[in-house]
Amino acid sequence: DLIDCNGRQCLTIACSGIDARVAESVHELGDSPLLSGRGSYLAAVAVNFLFRGIGQHWRVTLDDEVIEDDFALVSMCNGRYYGGGSTPVPEARMDDGVLHTVLVKNISRMKFAGLFSAYSAGRYRSLPPEVIRVVTAKNVRIQSEDDIVTCLDGETIHSRDVRLTLSEKRLNFFGPKGCDPNYGAGPK
């Protein structure tokens, strides 16, 4: 499976919001001779978390359901891992024709920091349903009056209208006998 985002293809996770802004900042800060690797990531988290705020006001359409609210992030997951090992939806599989979309409402910095570990570890079911929701919508649209930063497998784009859907294109993997691309995936 692949995710189509405004005509661009993504294999694992397409995320919009705070996580995409952090990814973009990592690339920007990575050019600094004073920062590299983990240092640029930690600096990017600090800049975005402390100085830029977490959420943005978006109109999110999940198939036919429209939600207008302030969101910290919206991520469409085809794979399980991104951002240095975060696993928001452990049951996401790259070969099942299902895309899991995670919606995280805008919350205070303190609450976000307190919930991030569970989110990153794929324990979204243990988090408050008024804060996080996971759905299997076929079409997701995110609209805003301001630019939305979206990260597609590490590459960022800017748009005020982000359209995410299961791509008609497919990708074949080759690996050694017995290799399973879904090894470690949660139950279907």
What are these regions (language model features)?
Residues 1-72:
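Catalytic core of DAGKc-family lipid kinases
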Residues 28-40, 90-111:
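Gly/Ser/Thr-rich active-site loops/lids in small-molecule metabolic enzymes
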Residues 5, 13, 25, 76, ...:
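Short beta-strand-to-turn element immediately C-terminal to the catalytic PLP-Schiff-base lysine
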Residues 19-22, 68-70, 82-85, 109-113:
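Short acidic/glycine-rich loop or secondary-structure boundary segments that cap or lie
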Residues 62-68, 93-94, 103-188:
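ATP/nucleoside-binding phosphotransfer catalytic cores, i.e., glycine-rich phosphate-binding loops
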Residues 15, 19, 75-89, 156:
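Glycine-rich phosphate/pyrophosphate-binding beta-alpha loops
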Residues 3, 22, 74, 101, ...:
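A residue-level signal for conserved active-site and pocket-lining positions in enzyme catalytic cores
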Residues 43-47, 56-63, 84-89, 125-128, ...:
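Glycine-rich, charged/polar anion/phosphate-binding loops
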